[in-house]
Amino acid sequence: MAARDSDSEEDLVSYGTGLEPLEEGERPKKPIPLQDQTVRDEKGRYKRFHGAFSGGFSAGYFNTVGSKEGWTPSTFVSSRQNRADKSVLGPEDFMDEEDLSEFGIAPKAIVTTDDFASKTKDRIREKARQLAAATAPIPGATLLDDLITPAKLSVGFELLRKMGWKEGQGVGPRVKRRPRRQKPDPGVKIYGCALPPGSSEGSEGEDDDYLPDNVTFAPKDVTPVDFTPKDNVHGLAYKGLDPHQALFGTSGEHFNLFSGGSERAGDLGEIGLNKGRKLGISGQAFGVGALEEEDDDIYATETLSKYDTVLKDEEPGDGLYGWTAPRQYKNQKESEKDLRYVGKILDGFSLASKPLSSKKIYPPPELPRDYRPVHYFRPMVAATSENSHLLQVLSESAGKATPDPGTHSKHQLNASKRAELLGETPIQGSATSVLEFLSQKDKERIKEMKQATDLKAAQLKARSLAQNAQSSRAQLSPAAAAGHCSWNMALGGGTATLKASNFKPFAKDPEKQKRYDEFLVHMKQGQKDALERCLDPSMTEWERGRERDEFARAALLYASSHSTLSSRFTHAKEEDDSDQVEVPRDQENDVGDKQSAVKMKMFGKLTRDTFEWHPDKLLCKRFNVPDPYPDSTLVGLPRVKRDKYSVFNFLTLPETASLPTTQASSEKVSQHRGPDKSRKPSRWDTSKHEKKEDSISEFLSLARSKAEPPKQQSSPLVNKEEEHAPELSANQTVNKDVDAQAEGEGSRPSMDLFRAIFASSSDEKSSSSEDEQGDSEDDQAGSGEANFQSSQDTDLGETSSVAHALVPAPQEPPPSFPIQKMQIDEREEFGPRLPPVFCPNARQTLEVPQKEKHKKNKDKHKAKKEHRRKKEKKKKHRKHKHKGKQKNKKPEKSSSSESSDSSDSQSDEETADVSPQELLRRLKSLPLRRQ
């Protein structure tokens, strides 16, 4: 027994590391808690942790990486000799031993690689790959992938294998018995000899009987349905050129060169592989790297039995036997289907064996001759006194009015309608207003008090309106005052009468709005039963009471809102200048010339606009540019008032133009343009000779000046000219000297006007501008002559206008206005132009000062030429040339300059000291000169 026990002890198998035996009396050690445990390395030394929470790496003396100095740069070692021994470092070369351990970030484990895996071919994987290749945009593209990268199983296959799935089995619950062979369909007839009763089916059934019940089998491996989403722009079931069918053919077509050597070729276009070769592109002409071994001879498998040796009739069909031809069906039914449907059938679909029953199409119904596609239902209008006009219109359009069927039916009438037909008086309902409970005397007393208060309010309003009319009569023109009074009367009448012309609370219901208007009319007349009269007798008592409350509430609301608005707003004290609007000054001119230039396609200067724009001073500072108008107070475009375009401006246009209105308009323009004389000339100031206006623009400007209403607050000069206007027209045969004396005493302007015209300020300005343009005069000779001519016209126009203000009108009849206007046009460069002259001797008075002005201009040109010669001679003097000529010409220049200066100073002194009478005498004595 002892031996047996010892043998049994020796046969025991021990697992794990045994504990050290404890000595007698020694207690077992307690486990060390987690916080007291330490980490040691292989040699038993304590390990220090260097991380983010314990100081990180250290490069000092202690605990350094390699040396006392810490990191040291490695010396350069040439790798030319041992270049072949150089190995590429990977991440594992930089890891610690802890990272490569079992609990590290890259533990080492023994794993079976693909090289040592099973060599059996995975059919499921191949079918999936071929399905992917067939549905790809380029079929057969996976052939190149097989050549480049090896195919690997996905995660799904790995999971299935770990769950117990094996290659070649299906996915799903296990079955107990093998599936029996499918029995033939009883509806299908089988021709030929019947099989003997004892066949393989019986033996298979007998084999199944011997199998135990607890044995299960894996389901059959079935290729899953391809649920690939359509993510391309091709049509349904579109496939490009399949290289399997094009190069190698399929089993059901004309012939297949590789059918003998490939037994595994399926519908997916699987290519049979000879000699265990890899999939690849076969070809004799080009080499493709690793596939440059000798290819199979495809012509060695050909036999002459596949070709016809006897001439015979052509086979039915179109003769297209290539791989692109549609498939030919064997039996007649399929050929009929082929004729009916040409194309490829989608995967999962098949042609129907029975045709669809054709739908019977019925002909459309026959329309009558008088049929109209749109039917118009004529309105049914009852014959009452209120809509007699509507009934008449309907009878004229349709021939007769449609009677209301409700009036003849007894079922359509209610009690109120029957009472109305019988002529009975409607029964009054209960009182819904507090006023109806009052007695008759109290109602009359309230009415008298209301009339008294209304009368006092009307008297006070009339007094205030009369006072306002008297105070505003001096400020308003007669037409505007008449319109203002009529507007006040209309406003007072609207306030006194409670008429809601614009206030329609029941606009959606015309009948109700009509009753509400009748209620307001009765209320204005002061009738007591206004509400009861306007209500519809066909309504019920509840509806009548509700409508009575709505009418009273609406009238109260309108009265309160009307009184609130009238108390908050008042009439205007001053008249709005409705006949004029402010527009930019440069836009005031007529744009007819520009439009005509655009029509003629003459683009350029004629279609461009130049505006005078005054920038803000802060803007000039920000952009660091000088202010072009330092003395200007305007910002933006200068604006002037212009008449509104209206038909009424031309209704009161007289045949001949009169002098006072023109003078008043010019004085008005001078008041607007007075403080802006120092500005630069703009397009507004250009003369009409340069603009070349047509007769239409002249007519418009004349109509504006004539249609402008005269203001009462005009200057005294205009009033005096208006008083003397009839004298100029009526007393044309009076003596010339008497008229001159009366006109000079009555309408003599101030001396400022004479100084502005005859002083040398304009000459100085023109001379300074000519000096500035002196260097470029040779290049701009044409423009200088034009400016000189325009300045001559300006001076002549100003002189003639003042002379006409002093000289009386002669006895000869005045010429027409447009001709005179074209002769007296001037350039408005230094302010507004003066009124035109209406006298026959205007041309003479215009030509009188032309000679003197022409002489002054000649003197200016001479002085300018001499100044230019002086500069040239100074240059020659610096070069020390022509000294003798310079000495001879110096006294001549000094004498000529002194004479010109003295003449200018004398002329200035004479013009400053000459009296107005002497000036008139000199103007009369000047000789006339024709140009």
Curated annotation (Swiss-Prot):
Q: Is Transferase set as a keyword in this record? A: no
InterPro entries assigned to the protein according to its UniProt record, in alphabetical order: DUF1604, G_patch_dom
Composition bias of kind Low complexity appears in 896-905
Query: Compositional bias (Polar residues) spans?
Result: 659-668, 786-802
Q: Can the keyword Electron transport be found in this entry's annotation?
A: no
Q: Name one GO cellular component term.
A: nucleus
Q: Which GO terms describe its biological process?
A: mRNA splicing, via spliceosome
Residues modified as N-acetylalanine: A2
Location of the G-patch domain: 152-198
Q: Where is the composition biased (Basic and acidic residues)?
A: 582-593, 669-695
Feature: compositional bias, Acidic residues: 769-780
- UniProt lists compositionally biased (Basic residues) regions at 852-888, 922-931
| Annotated spans, Disordered | 1-41, 73-92, 169-209, 568-595, 659-931
Residues recorded as bearing Phosphoserine in the entry:
S6, S8, S357, S477, S715
Q: Which Pfam families match?
A: DUF1604, G-patch
Listed A to Z, the keywords are:
Acetylation, Isopeptide bond, Phosphoprotein, Ubl conjugation
Per its record, what are the GO molecular function terms? RNA binding
Q: Where is this cross-link: Glycyl lysine isopeptide (Lys-Gly) (interchain with G-Cter in SUMO2)?
A: K312
Task: Report the family membership.
Answer: Belongs to the GPATCH1 family.
**What is the protein name stated in its UniProt record?**
G patch domain-containing protein 1
| Species lineage | Eukaryota, Metazoa, Chordata, Craniata, Vertebrata
